[in-house]
Amino acid sequence: MSKAYEQSGVNIHAGYEAVERMSSHVKRTMRKEVIGGLGGFGATFDLSQLNMTAPVLVSGTDGVGTKLKLAIDYGKHDSIGIDAVAMCVNDILTTGAEPLYFLDYIATNKVVPEVIEQIVKGISDACVETNTALIGGETAEMGEMYHEGEYDVAGFAVGAVEKDDYVDSSEVKEGQVVIGLASSGIHSNGYSLVRKLINESGIDLASNFDNRPFIDVFLEPTKLYVKPVLALKKEVSIKAMNHITGGGFYENIPRALPAGYAARIDTTSFPTPKIFDWLQQQGNIDTNEMYNIFNMGIGYTVIVDEKDASRALKILAEQNVEAYQIGHIMKNESTAIELLGV
Protein backbone atom coordinates (compact mmCIF):
# COMPACT_ATOMS: atom_id res chain seq x y z
CA MET A 1 0.00 0.00 0.00
CA SER A 2 1.46 3.35 -1.01
CA LYS A 3 2.21 6.09 1.50
CA ALA A 4 0.06 8.39 -0.59
CA TYR A 5 -3.00 6.20 0.06
CA GLU A 6 -2.32 6.14 3.80
CA GLN A 7 -1.85 9.91 3.76
CA SER A 8 -5.34 10.20 2.25
CA GLY A 9 -6.77 8.77 5.47
CA VAL A 10 -6.95 5.01 4.87
CA ASN A 11 -5.18 2.97 7.57
CA ILE A 12 -4.40 -0.28 5.81
CA HIS A 13 -2.63 -1.70 8.86
CA ALA A 14 -5.77 -1.26 10.97
CA GLY A 15 -7.65 -3.10 8.24
CA TYR A 16 -5.22 -6.00 8.39
CA GLU A 17 -5.55 -6.16 12.17
CA ALA A 18 -9.35 -6.14 11.93
CA VAL A 19 -9.26 -9.08 9.51
CA GLU A 20 -6.93 -10.98 11.82
CA ARG A 21 -9.16 -10.32 14.82
CA MET A 22 -12.36 -11.37 13.06
CA SER A 23 -11.01 -14.53 11.42
CA SER A 24 -11.43 -16.77 14.46
CA HIS A 25 -15.05 -15.68 14.82
CA VAL A 26 -15.78 -16.28 11.14
CA LYS A 27 -14.29 -19.77 11.26
CA ARG A 28 -16.85 -20.77 13.91
CA THR A 29 -19.64 -20.32 11.38
CA MET A 30 -18.38 -22.59 8.61
CA ARG A 31 -20.57 -25.34 7.13
CA LYS A 32 -19.40 -28.39 5.18
CA GLU A 33 -20.90 -26.96 1.99
CA VAL A 34 -18.55 -23.96 1.99
CA ILE A 35 -15.77 -24.32 -0.58
CA GLY A 36 -12.46 -22.67 0.17
CA GLY A 37 -11.76 -20.08 2.82
CA LEU A 38 -11.67 -16.35 3.35
CA GLY A 39 -9.86 -13.96 1.06
CA GLY A 40 -11.16 -14.94 -2.35
CA PHE A 41 -12.86 -12.59 -4.77
CA GLY A 42 -16.07 -14.59 -4.47
CA ALA A 43 -17.41 -16.93 -1.78
CA THR A 44 -18.56 -20.39 -2.89
CA PHE A 45 -21.16 -22.78 -1.53
CA ASP A 46 -21.86 -26.32 -2.79
CA LEU A 47 -25.64 -26.72 -3.14
CA SER A 48 -25.29 -30.36 -4.22
CA GLN A 49 -24.48 -31.31 -0.62
CA LEU A 50 -27.87 -30.12 0.63
CA ASN A 51 -29.60 -33.33 -0.52
CA MET A 52 -32.46 -31.32 -1.99
CA THR A 53 -34.27 -32.48 -5.11
CA ALA A 54 -35.36 -29.09 -6.41
CA PRO A 55 -33.85 -26.36 -4.23
CA VAL A 56 -35.18 -22.83 -4.51
CA LEU A 57 -32.80 -20.11 -3.39
CA VAL A 58 -34.24 -17.32 -1.25
CA SER A 59 -32.30 -14.13 -0.58
CA GLY A 60 -32.74 -11.12 1.64
CA THR A 61 -30.83 -8.00 2.62
CA ASP A 62 -31.32 -5.53 5.44
CA GLY A 63 -29.60 -3.21 7.87
CA VAL A 64 -29.94 -2.32 11.52
CA GLY A 65 -31.13 1.26 11.06
CA THR A 66 -30.71 4.01 13.61
CA LYS A 67 -30.46 1.54 16.48
CA LEU A 68 -26.79 1.81 15.52
CA LYS A 69 -26.67 5.33 16.95
CA LEU A 70 -27.43 4.03 20.43
CA ALA A 71 -24.80 1.30 20.11
CA ILE A 72 -22.20 3.81 18.91
CA ASP A 73 -23.02 6.38 21.60
CA TYR A 74 -22.73 3.79 24.38
CA GLY A 75 -19.88 1.72 22.99
CA LYS A 76 -21.81 -1.56 22.83
CA HIS A 77 -21.15 -3.07 19.43
CA ASP A 78 -21.54 -6.86 19.70
CA SER A 79 -25.33 -7.10 19.80
CA ILE A 80 -25.66 -5.01 16.64
CA GLY A 81 -24.13 -7.88 14.68
CA ILE A 82 -26.87 -10.18 15.92
CA ASP A 83 -29.47 -7.66 14.74
CA ALA A 84 -27.92 -7.56 11.26
CA VAL A 85 -28.19 -11.32 10.87
CA ALA A 86 -31.63 -11.62 12.45
CA MET A 87 -33.20 -9.00 10.21
CA CYS A 88 -32.09 -10.97 7.15
CA VAL A 89 -32.54 -14.61 8.17
CA ASN A 90 -35.93 -14.01 9.81
CA ASP A 91 -37.13 -12.47 6.54
CA ILE A 92 -36.09 -15.37 4.31
CA LEU A 93 -37.39 -17.83 6.91
CA THR A 94 -40.94 -16.72 6.08
CA THR A 95 -40.70 -18.75 2.85
CA GLY A 96 -39.71 -21.86 4.77
CA ALA A 97 -36.09 -21.49 3.70
CA GLU A 98 -33.17 -22.73 5.76
CA PRO A 99 -30.51 -19.98 5.88
CA LEU A 100 -27.28 -21.15 4.26
CA TYR A 101 -24.86 -18.27 4.20
CA PHE A 102 -24.49 -14.62 5.10
CA LEU A 103 -22.34 -11.71 3.92
CA ASP A 104 -21.81 -8.51 5.87
CA TYR A 105 -21.00 -4.93 4.93
CA ILE A 106 -19.45 -2.58 7.47
CA ALA A 107 -18.70 1.03 6.49
CA THR A 108 -16.98 3.33 8.93
CA ASN A 109 -15.20 6.64 9.37
CA LYS A 110 -12.08 4.88 10.60
CA VAL A 111 -11.35 1.19 11.08
CA VAL A 112 -10.98 0.51 14.79
CA PRO A 113 -10.03 -3.19 14.95
CA GLU A 114 -11.54 -3.72 18.40
CA VAL A 115 -14.91 -2.34 17.28
CA ILE A 116 -14.95 -4.30 14.02
CA GLU A 117 -14.16 -7.45 15.98
CA GLN A 118 -17.09 -6.86 18.33
CA ILE A 119 -19.48 -6.36 15.42
CA VAL A 120 -18.26 -9.48 13.62
CA LYS A 121 -18.39 -11.48 16.85
CA GLY A 122 -22.09 -10.66 17.12
CA ILE A 123 -22.63 -11.56 13.47
CA SER A 124 -20.80 -14.85 14.00
CA ASP A 125 -22.73 -15.67 17.19
CA ALA A 126 -26.00 -15.29 15.29
CA CYS A 127 -24.68 -17.29 12.34
CA VAL A 128 -23.64 -20.14 14.65
CA GLU A 129 -27.07 -20.16 16.30
CA THR A 130 -28.83 -20.36 12.93
CA ASN A 131 -26.29 -22.66 11.21
CA THR A 132 -25.53 -19.95 8.68
CA ALA A 133 -22.03 -19.65 7.24
CA LEU A 134 -20.44 -16.20 7.26
CA ILE A 135 -18.68 -16.62 3.92
CA GLY A 136 -17.81 -13.09 2.94
CA GLY A 137 -17.99 -9.41 3.69
CA GLU A 138 -16.61 -5.96 3.18
CA THR A 139 -15.19 -3.46 5.64
CA ALA A 140 -14.89 -0.01 4.09
CA GLU A 141 -13.05 2.91 5.65
CA MET A 142 -14.61 6.12 4.35
CA GLY A 143 -13.56 9.07 6.44
CA GLU A 144 -15.28 11.59 4.21
CA MET A 145 -18.63 9.78 4.39
CA TYR A 146 -19.02 9.25 8.15
CA HIS A 147 -18.34 11.30 11.27
CA GLU A 148 -15.71 10.12 13.72
CA GLY A 149 -16.78 6.96 15.52
CA GLU A 150 -19.70 6.29 13.19
CA TYR A 151 -20.33 3.15 11.18
CA ASP A 152 -23.10 1.38 9.32
CA VAL A 153 -23.82 -2.34 9.19
CA ALA A 154 -25.84 -4.24 6.60
CA GLY A 155 -26.14 -7.88 5.64
CA PHE A 156 -27.21 -10.24 2.90
CA ALA A 157 -28.51 -13.77 3.51
CA VAL A 158 -29.24 -16.67 1.17
CA GLY A 159 -31.26 -19.74 2.06
CA ALA A 160 -32.82 -22.70 0.30
CA VAL A 161 -36.10 -24.57 0.43
CA GLU A 162 -37.43 -27.51 -1.54
CA LYS A 163 -39.69 -26.21 -4.28
CA ASP A 164 -42.58 -28.35 -3.04
CA ASP A 165 -42.11 -27.05 0.51
CA TYR A 166 -42.02 -23.35 -0.35
CA VAL A 167 -44.35 -21.41 1.95
CA ASP A 168 -46.54 -18.69 0.46
CA SER A 169 -50.11 -17.53 1.00
CA SER A 170 -51.77 -19.87 -1.50
CA GLU A 171 -53.11 -22.27 1.17
CA VAL A 172 -54.42 -19.64 3.58
CA LYS A 173 -58.12 -20.24 4.31
CA GLU A 174 -60.90 -19.05 6.56
CA GLY A 175 -60.77 -20.46 10.08
CA GLN A 176 -57.04 -21.02 10.23
CA VAL A 177 -55.19 -19.88 13.34
CA VAL A 178 -52.55 -17.18 13.73
CA ILE A 179 -49.83 -18.06 16.24
CA GLY A 180 -47.56 -15.32 17.50
CA LEU A 181 -44.00 -15.90 18.65
CA ALA A 182 -42.81 -13.53 21.34
CA SER A 183 -40.27 -10.86 20.50
CA SER A 184 -37.22 -10.10 22.64
CA GLY A 185 -38.17 -6.44 22.77
CA ILE A 186 -38.18 -3.61 20.26
CA HIS A 187 -35.99 -5.55 17.79
CA SER A 188 -34.58 -3.23 15.07
CA ASN A 189 -37.44 -1.01 13.93
CA GLY A 190 -38.83 2.31 15.09
CA TYR A 191 -35.55 3.59 16.51
CA SER A 192 -35.75 7.06 15.04
CA LEU A 193 -38.83 7.51 17.22
CA VAL A 194 -37.28 5.62 20.13
CA ARG A 195 -34.22 7.88 20.13
CA LYS A 196 -36.40 10.99 19.90
CA LEU A 197 -38.37 9.87 22.96
CA ILE A 198 -35.18 9.04 24.84
CA ASN A 199 -33.83 12.52 24.17
CA GLU A 200 -37.10 14.21 25.14
CA SER A 201 -37.40 12.22 28.36
CA GLY A 202 -33.92 13.09 29.59
CA ILE A 203 -33.54 9.65 31.16
CA ASP A 204 -30.19 8.29 32.26
CA LEU A 205 -29.75 5.21 30.10
CA ALA A 206 -27.60 3.65 32.81
CA SER A 207 -30.56 3.76 35.22
CA ASN A 208 -32.74 0.72 35.65
CA PHE A 209 -36.01 -0.06 33.93
CA ASP A 210 -37.78 -3.30 34.85
CA ASN A 211 -34.64 -4.50 36.68
CA ARG A 212 -32.30 -3.82 33.75
CA PRO A 213 -30.39 -0.75 32.59
CA PHE A 214 -32.40 1.20 30.02
CA ILE A 215 -29.57 0.89 27.50
CA ASP A 216 -29.65 -2.92 27.71
CA VAL A 217 -33.39 -2.90 27.09
CA PHE A 218 -33.04 -0.64 24.06
CA LEU A 219 -30.12 -2.63 22.62
CA GLU A 220 -31.59 -6.09 23.26
CA PRO A 221 -30.90 -7.90 19.97
CA THR A 222 -33.59 -9.04 17.58
CA LYS A 223 -34.75 -12.56 18.33
CA LEU A 224 -33.66 -15.30 15.93
CA TYR A 225 -36.59 -17.52 14.96
CA VAL A 226 -34.80 -19.93 12.61
CA LYS A 227 -34.37 -22.99 14.84
CA PRO A 228 -37.86 -23.07 16.38
CA VAL A 229 -39.66 -22.33 13.13
CA LEU A 230 -37.75 -24.94 11.13
CA ALA A 231 -38.45 -27.45 13.90
CA LEU A 232 -42.14 -26.55 13.70
CA LYS A 233 -42.14 -26.84 9.91
CA LYS A 234 -40.93 -30.45 10.14
CA GLU A 235 -43.98 -31.42 12.21
CA VAL A 236 -46.81 -29.10 11.16
CA SER A 237 -48.05 -27.78 7.82
CA ILE A 238 -47.42 -24.03 7.93
CA LYS A 239 -49.67 -22.03 5.60
CA ALA A 240 -47.97 -18.62 5.84
CA MET A 241 -45.50 -16.68 7.98
CA ASN A 242 -44.65 -13.08 8.84
CA HIS A 243 -41.65 -11.31 10.29
CA ILE A 244 -43.05 -8.32 12.20
CA THR A 245 -40.67 -5.49 11.32
CA GLY A 246 -41.13 -1.88 10.19
CA GLY A 247 -44.82 -1.06 9.97
CA GLY A 248 -45.77 -3.35 12.83
CA PHE A 249 -48.88 -5.52 12.64
CA TYR A 250 -50.74 -3.36 10.16
CA GLU A 251 -48.15 -3.48 7.40
CA ASN A 252 -46.63 -6.93 7.89
CA ILE A 253 -49.41 -9.38 8.68
CA PRO A 254 -51.37 -8.58 5.48
CA ARG A 255 -48.29 -9.45 3.41
CA ALA A 256 -48.93 -13.15 4.02
CA LEU A 257 -52.61 -13.09 3.13
CA PRO A 258 -54.27 -13.63 -0.25
CA ALA A 259 -56.81 -11.12 -1.52
CA GLY A 260 -60.19 -11.39 0.17
CA TYR A 261 -58.86 -12.60 3.52
CA ALA A 262 -58.04 -10.85 6.78
CA ALA A 263 -56.40 -11.70 10.07
CA ARG A 264 -58.44 -10.90 13.17
CA ILE A 265 -55.95 -10.41 16.00
CA ASP A 266 -56.86 -10.26 19.69
CA THR A 267 -54.27 -7.97 21.26
CA THR A 268 -55.26 -9.15 24.76
CA SER A 269 -54.09 -12.69 23.97
CA PHE A 270 -50.40 -11.95 24.48
CA PRO A 271 -48.36 -9.82 26.89
CA THR A 272 -46.87 -6.51 25.78
CA PRO A 273 -43.36 -5.82 27.11
CA LYS A 274 -43.25 -2.89 29.51
CA ILE A 275 -40.88 -0.91 27.30
CA PHE A 276 -43.69 -0.39 24.80
CA ASP A 277 -45.88 1.07 27.56
CA TRP A 278 -43.05 3.45 28.43
CA LEU A 279 -42.65 4.53 24.81
CA GLN A 280 -46.39 5.03 24.37
CA GLN A 281 -46.72 7.09 27.53
CA GLN A 282 -43.60 9.13 26.84
CA GLY A 283 -44.74 10.01 23.33
CA ASN A 284 -48.49 10.11 24.01
CA ILE A 285 -48.92 7.74 21.06
CA ASP A 286 -52.26 6.29 20.02
CA THR A 287 -52.48 2.52 20.54
CA ASN A 288 -53.34 1.84 16.91
CA GLU A 289 -50.27 3.82 15.88
CA MET A 290 -48.12 1.75 18.23
CA TYR A 291 -49.24 -1.37 16.36
CA ASN A 292 -48.34 0.38 13.11
CA ILE A 293 -44.77 1.10 14.29
CA PHE A 294 -43.63 -1.62 16.69
CA ASN A 295 -43.93 -5.39 17.09
CA MET A 296 -45.64 -4.89 20.48
CA GLY A 297 -44.33 -8.19 21.80
CA ILE A 298 -44.88 -10.43 18.77
CA GLY A 299 -41.89 -10.68 16.45
CA TYR A 300 -43.01 -13.46 14.14
CA THR A 301 -46.28 -15.16 13.20
CA VAL A 302 -47.24 -18.47 11.64
CA ILE A 303 -50.61 -19.49 10.23
CA VAL A 304 -51.71 -23.11 10.68
CA ASP A 305 -54.89 -25.14 10.42
CA GLU A 306 -57.02 -24.98 13.57
CA LYS A 307 -56.49 -28.70 14.21
CA ASP A 308 -52.71 -28.12 14.34
CA ALA A 309 -52.73 -25.09 16.65
CA SER A 310 -52.30 -26.89 19.98
CA ARG A 311 -49.58 -29.10 18.59
CA ALA A 312 -47.77 -26.11 17.13
CA LEU A 313 -47.82 -24.32 20.48
CA LYS A 314 -46.46 -27.46 22.17
CA ILE A 315 -43.60 -27.77 19.67
CA LEU A 316 -42.66 -24.12 20.07
CA ALA A 317 -42.71 -24.47 23.85
CA GLU A 318 -40.33 -27.42 23.52
CA GLN A 319 -38.07 -25.08 21.53
CA ASN A 320 -38.13 -22.64 24.47
CA VAL A 321 -40.14 -20.06 22.56
CA GLU A 322 -43.05 -18.21 24.12
CA ALA A 323 -45.92 -18.44 21.67
CA TYR A 324 -49.61 -17.58 21.75
CA GLN A 325 -52.73 -18.21 19.71
CA ILE A 326 -53.38 -14.58 18.83
CA GLY A 327 -56.03 -14.69 16.13
CA HIS A 328 -57.63 -16.37 13.16
CA ILE A 329 -58.21 -15.92 9.44
CA MET A 330 -61.56 -14.75 8.09
CA LYS A 331 -62.96 -13.66 4.76
CA ASN A 332 -62.99 -9.91 4.32
CA GLU A 333 -62.91 -7.89 1.11
CA SER A 334 -62.49 -4.47 2.73
CA THR A 335 -59.50 -4.90 5.05
CA ALA A 336 -56.66 -7.35 5.60
CA ILE A 337 -56.32 -6.99 9.37
CA GLU A 338 -58.55 -6.30 12.35
CA LEU A 339 -57.10 -5.63 15.78
CA LEU A 340 -59.34 -6.29 18.75
CA GLY A 341 -58.68 -4.68 22.11
CA VAL A 342 -56.94 -1.51 20.92
UniProtKB/Swiss-Prot annotation:
Biological process per Gene Ontology, one example term: adenine biosynthetic process
Name of the protein described by the UniProt record: Phosphoribosylformylglycinamidine cyclo-ligase
Main location per the UniProt record: cytoplasm
Species annotation: Staphylococcus aureus (strain MSSA476)
GO function terms (MF aspect): ATP binding; phosphoribosylamine-glycine ligase activity; phosphoribosylformylglycinamidine cyclo-ligase activity
Ligase recorded as keyword: yes
Family: Belongs to the AIR synthase family.
EC class of the enzyme, as a word: ligase
Organism superkingdom: Bacteria
Assigned EC number: 6.3.3.1
Pfam families attached to this UniProt entry: AIRS, AIRS_C
Pathway(s) this gene product operates in, as recorded in its UniProt entry: Purine metabolism; IMP biosynthesis via de novo pathway; 5-amino-1-(5-phospho-D-ribosyl)imidazole from N(2)-formyl-N(1)-(5-phospho-D-ribosyl)glycinamide: step 2/2
